């Protein structure tokens, strides 16, 4: 076999594996969405979504080693965006940190940029919520001033 033929064969095999994996993950996402309606436990939901996300990113990093064009895949970007947004829907700092850990599986700048944008939106929404609560005196002013800082030990 010539090197180009070998590469083409590997490329076709990986493309097939990628499409099968993506279709399985999309099916899993539908199951997760159905699960959300039945069960309101956020932790279980996040664990399921993170497992799916990890599977996507591992597949992605494996494919990127063979084809650098993989990162420009629109369907992949949409899939990753869906995963990130589903995790951020819970509005928890923990899910954001888990998303950040997921980014380490890949060098995708699109995913990194998406995470940064979502992080900024998350922080802004939290600050607005705290400011609103402070106006109605439902939380202490101290909590509003130091909302994202750990209390210093005196």
From Swiss-Prot:
Keywords noted in UniProt: Apoptosis, G0/G1 host cell cycle checkpoint dysregulation by virus, Host mitochondrion, Host nucleus, Host-virus interaction, Modulation of host cell apoptosis by virus, Modulation of host cell cycle by virus
Region described as Mitochondrial targeting signal: spans on this chain: 80-138
Record motif Bipartite nuclear localization signal, residues: 135-153
Subcellular location(s) per record: Host nucleus, Host nucleolus; Host mitochondrion
Keyword Transcription among UniProt keywords: no
Protein origin, superkingdom: Viruses
Region annotation (Nucleolar targeting) ranges: 134-154
The keyword Transferase belongs to this UniProt entry's keyword annotation: no
Broad class of the protein's primary localization: host cell
Any one of the GO CC terms: host cell mitochondrion
The name this protein goes by in its record: ORF3b protein
Organism: Severe acute respiratory syndrome coronavirus
């Amino acid at each position: 076999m010539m090197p180009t033929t070998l590469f083409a064969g590997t490329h076709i095999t990986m493309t097939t594996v990628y499409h099968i994996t993506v279709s399985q993950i999309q099916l899993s996402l539908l199951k997760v969405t159905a699960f959300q309606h039945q069960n309101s436990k956020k932790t279980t939901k996040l664990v399921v979504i993170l497992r799916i996300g990890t599977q996507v990113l591992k597949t992605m990093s494996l494919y990127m080693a063979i084809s650098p064009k993989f990162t420009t895949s629109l369907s992949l970007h949409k899939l990753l965006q869906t995963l990130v947004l589903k995790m951020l829907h819970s509005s928890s700092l923990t899910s954001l940190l888990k998303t950040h850990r997921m980014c380490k599986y890949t060098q995708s700048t699109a995913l990194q940029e998406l995470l940064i944008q979502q992080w900024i939106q998350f922080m802004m929404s939290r600050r607005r919520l705290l400011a609103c609560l402070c106006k109605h005196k439902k939380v202490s002013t101290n909590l509003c001033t130091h909302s994202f800082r750990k209390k210093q030990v005196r």
